A protein has these predicted regions:
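HINT/intein-family self-processing domains that catalyze protein splicing or autoproteolytic maturation
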Residues: 1-175
Length: 175
């Protein structure tokens, strides 16, 4: 499954989200406690996971909406869950860091108006199914890392642990 790709499953910082009250905020400006628009309403951000990109570059798909997302991060597009790489062109671009989120509920955050799945979502349908990103295992790992208690974990590239088949099995805090 492509969802097992070891590249960062995240959003570029210049993508945007709507916060409660109707304001539009860049993803790299969101903090724990912000209440963001989800597919089904609003949810509070529990934790922001900021991952620095190797050599300041990463593969990104930029959609017409302005959503800049890694190629294998599931999004809800035209009535179904899809990988961005199947919708737009993958480009290796300058990007200092990418961002992921742990939400309190409704684990489908709207980024540039597109529902995007978040860590620990618990869904097991189609491409959303993931034995790590989609389960509480990732949340358990994040809870052990410096920054969880303040809602901001900063990771370096290479933080994703894979098995001998290249399947994502964990995150490692690497300073």
């Amino acid at each position: 499954s492509y969802y097992n790709d070891s590249s960062n499953p995240c959003f570029a910082g210049w993508s945007t989200s709507e916060v409660l009250g109707g304001g539009i905020v860049r993803v790299d400006q969101l903090v724990s406690g912000d209440i963001v628009r989800t597919r089904d309403g609003y949810s509070s951000i529990i934790c922001v996971v900021k991952t620095y990109c190797k050599d300041g570059r990463t593969d990104i798909v930029t959609l017409d909406s302005g959503l800049a997302i890694t190629p294998f991060h599931p999004i809800f597009y035209k009535g179904r869950w899809e990988y961005p790489k199947n919708i737009g062109e993958v480009s290796n671009i300058e990007c200092k860091a990418v961002y992921s989120f742990v939400l309190e509920k409704d684990h489908m955050m709207l980024i540039n108006g597109t529902p995007c799945i978040c860590f620990g979502h618990g869904f097991d349908e189609g491409i959303l199914q993931h034995h790590y990103y989609g389960t509480h295992r990732i949340i358990d790992d994040l809870k052990t890392m410096p920054g969880w208690n303040i809602g901001l974990i900063e990771l370096q590239s290479g933080c994703i642990k894979v098995d001998e088949y290249g399947i994502v099995i964990g995150l490692v805090y690497n300073t």
